[in-house]
Amino acid sequence: MSEVRLPPLRALDDFVLGSARLVAPDPCDPQRWCHRVINNLLYYQTNYLICFGLGLALAGYVRPLHTLLSALVVAVALGMLVCAAENRAAVRRCRRSHPAACLAAVLAVGFLVLWAAGGAGTFLLSIAGPVLLILVHASLRLRNLKNKIENKIESIGLKRTPMGLLLEALGQEQEAGS
């Protein structure tokens, strides 16, 4: 296995401006929609990481303690999901067949814990808000030829990225190559 590397930052023109083609996905074809989201998450992962970081920085500036608590709670919930999926076949099957529900469950657990601790608003601003914006962009952005080539290289194992590892942990590695 090759070393894990972050792909280059995609141009703003490619990401959201001029050449970016944004089209609503077909809700009647969830498989194709899922492939679009996964492939866009892989291709634009550096841009998404920056967007997520900006959301965390903004919330961290406003409420630093609640932002750290939010990040910790979500990391623990995600770690528990991955650990449970590695040890229990039923959880692994659920994670693979219902990835959106698993992500929603992780975010819901994080929200409930932080609501009890008084940091629900910060959680929504720092974690859930950027994740929602990233998923909306990944759903709307049509793939281009360069995107498809990069995703093929990732899927055959010639290149490893942090998003690829995260998708594997969430049980989506078989989807990424499609």
From Swiss-Prot:
Keywords: Endosome, Membrane, Protein transport, Transmembrane, Transmembrane helix, Transport
Cell compartments where the protein resides: Endosome membrane
InterPro entries, per the entry: Prenylated_rab_accept_PRA1
GO biological process, one term: protein transport
Segments crossing the lipid bilayer: 42-62, 65-85, 97-119, 123-140
A single GO cellular-component term on record: endosome membrane
Topological domain spans for side Cytoplasmic: 1-41, 86-96, 141-178
Main location: membrane
Membrane topology summary: Multi-pass membrane protein
Residue ranges, Extracellular side: 63-64, 120-122
Pfam families according to UniProt: PRA1 (PF03208)
Role according to the record: May be involved in ER/Golgi transport and vesicular traffic. Plays a proapoptotic role in cerulenin-induced neuroblastoma apoptosis.
PANTHER family: PRA1 FAMILY PROTEIN 2 (PTHR12859:SF1), PRA1 PROTEIN (PTHR12859)
Subunit structure: Interacts with CCR5 and GDE1.
Sequence similarity: Belongs to the PRA1 family.
Protein name per the record: PRA1 family protein 2
Species this protein is from: Bos taurus (Bovine)
Taxonomic placement: Eukaryota, Metazoa, Chordata, Craniata, Vertebrata
